[in-house]
Amino acid sequence: MKKILLTCLLASASFQVSSHTSEVLSGYWAYQEFLEKFPQQGVLTRELSEVVRNAPVPLKRHQSKPIRISVVFPGQQISDYWVRNLSAFEKRMDKLQISYQINQVFTRPNADVKQQSVSLMEALKSKSDYLIFTLDTTRHRKFIEHVLDSSETKLILQNITTPVQAWDKRQPFLYVGFDHAEGSIALADKFKQLYPQGANYSVLYFSEGYVSDARGDTFIHQMNHSDRFALKSSFYTKATKASGYESAKNSLERYPDVDFIYACSTDVALGAIDALKELGRTNIKINGWGGGSAELDAIAAGDLDLTVMRMNDDTGIAMAEAIKWDIEGRTVPTVFSGDFEVVTKEDSPEHIELLKKRAFRYSDQP
């Protein structure tokens, strides 16, 4: 397998998802809503989920040449989700004995728009068979629509599991990730258990865009079901640890009477933890989002109270299996969401270790 790496220094639990998710995310099908509206999609998604959880079965169809894959990821952040995801993808592709060439570009989230645009156009010019990208901003959406309208390259959209309604007749090859609404609702349910009498809270968003809407607004919407919980403040960040620190300080200086902070990403949560320590407010609970290595270390240290842990490698494996199905001429589902588990600092190290072995079953391999 030929691998081309461009390093850019520019940056199984199922939860009941509210029927109001599509109200929070206007213009998108909620994950479960989509599967219910299109029953055959539900069948295909469940079949792919089974394959993801099982051992790989090598490709039996002959390939006349390697397939070409381009990857543009916002991987330069403390969260190791993207790097692990790609590692799991490549290892599963190798286990499936698929011949491929891959071109990778990692950038910072919410930055390097010019670099992303250049990399994306290069992927199209090289006539990649598959392009793995994400959708968070309006700029991303315009590029994706260009690909859907004018290219034979098959588009895999990472970190989104809510199909765009306007693309109904020309959906991407695959939406894949861990459903943000599902994870956020699981965290909301846990906070309600932790504060049965109610609580005041603040929200630290990711940068403006889809992820903040899906994680932050869904959480607020869910907490609003009870009048015992009061949102005191909400701040957008720059999706970095430094901005999480600054936003947490600003929030607590203006609205000190809070019981917990809901953070929409790893980097934001870790920055907020530093602010809580500096201000002597470690009595305030705070969550992570994703349950990667940095968050699990913070939970072990007692700095992070809880997180929703993605079974991280599920999505990398799902992308590889979807490509295998495509090569074999099988119908691929439109959307796939991996599994979650809620983890708290009260959980035993043994329990967390078992979850890590499941979540990182490929990406922890040498």
Swiss-Prot record:
Keyword Signal: yes
Taxonomy, superkingdom: Bacteria
Protein name, entry field: Autoinducer 2-binding periplasmic protein LuxP
Molecular functions (GO terms): carbohydrate binding
Gene3D superfamilies attached to this UniProt entry: 3.40.50.2300
PANTHER family: D-ALLOSE-BINDING PERIPLASMIC PROTEIN-RELATED (PTHR46847:SF1)
Location of this chain's protein in the cell: Periplasm
One Pfam family of this chain: Peripla_BP_4
Function: Binds to an autoinducer molecule. This complex then interacts with the LuxQ sensor protein.
Family: Belongs to the bacterial solute-binding protein 2 family.
Alphabetic keyword roster: Periplasm, Signal
InterPro entries the record matches: Peripla_BP_I, SBP_2_dom
Species, as recorded: Vibrio vulnificus (strain CMCP6)
Position of the signal peptide: 1-13
Listed GO CC annotations: periplasmic space
Entry-linked SUPFAM superfamilies: Periplasmic binding protein-like I (SSF53822)
